[in-house]
Amino acid sequence: MNLRRKNRLWVVCAVLAGLALTTALVLYALRANIDLFYTPGEILYGKRETQQLPAVGQRLRVGGMVMPGSVRRDPDSLKVNFSLYDAEGSVTVSYEGILPDLFREGQGVVVQGTLEKGNHVLAHEVLAKHDENYTPPEVEKAMQENHRRPQRADKDTSS
């Protein structure tokens, strides 16, 4: 091997090592912001593809429906406990804070938090889902008022 090829080999190796180091540092920095999405059934039985269960203490997002009759509010604080369910099972959730206006039983929600023992999620954030047809009540009222039928022009209103 001549000197020119050796220099090229060293440059290529240095560039590859630099890329590997950069990738490792980026992944290390982002690990605190990576939250995997699970459904209640996937927490209980694992992801469909890998059958891998989330670890206790893992940060995650859980999406499901609020089980009717499961919402329990602490009268002395903002603590709320409820169950999320899907077709495969349910998990319990604890949250302390103000819930979104759209939060109610039977409604779809996404909670972000950490998995505790016993399939319990300690939520740090609760997001209520709504469908694409949602209209705020104020807008609905305004639309109803604006779309009233006009009075007939041939009707005599003076008598």
Swiss-Prot record:
Membrane topology: Single-pass type II membrane protein
Region (Disordered) location: 129-159
One Gene Ontology term, aspect cellular component: plasma membrane
Pfam families associated with the record: CcmE (PF03100)
InterPro entries: CcmE (IPR004329), CcmE-like_sf (IPR036127), NA-bd_OB-fold (IPR012340)
GO biological process, one term: cytochrome complex assembly
Stated name of the protein: Cytochrome c-type biogenesis protein CcmE
